[in-house]
């Protein structure tokens, strides 16, 4: 009962608990800025290793919050988070591709919105599996590195990098 001196309702409490993971997930969206990136994003192993570490950190730091967000958000204002995030990421990637095309005219950006959408859905599948299964850190590192390599190779092929 005293907690409601600080929060107006259960949903506000829930959102406050999940705020750190939400901030990190949205930071991933906003990191897609063509003005700040080069074509090497598709070929640079250092960038790929950074991506691997970001996912490891996300799951390691927020496993419980991710579980709540992905599996226990029904009835809250975050129950549609996955689809809202997927839509936001799809729009952001589309704009990112347009910016990259301006910098690198030879790039093929004629990729369907649905494929971009599906790529974000795969991200949630990856996060769900890592949250549900207690994968050892070494295995997680290898698995995420494989995922990033697979994803990067696919984008390189589709975009004619």
Q: Where are these predicted regions, by residue range?
A:
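Helix-turn-helix
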Residues: 1-12, 16
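Sequence-specific DNA-binding recognition helix
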Residues: 10, 39-44
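Alpha-helical structural segments
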Residues: 12-35, 46, 50-54, 80, ...
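Amphipathic alpha-helical segments that line or abut small-molecule/effector binding pockets
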Residues: 22, 42-64, 121, 125, ...
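Solvent-exposed, amphipathic alpha-helical segments
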Residues: 24-35, 65, 122-130
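Amphipathic alpha-helical packing segments from all-alpha helical-bundle domains
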Residues: 30-31, 54-61, 76-102, 113-124
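Short linear capping/connector segments at secondary-structure termini
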Residues: 35-41, 69-76, 105-108
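Hydrophobic/aromatic-rich alpha-helical bundle segments in the mid-to-C-terminal region
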Residues: 67, 100-150, 158-161
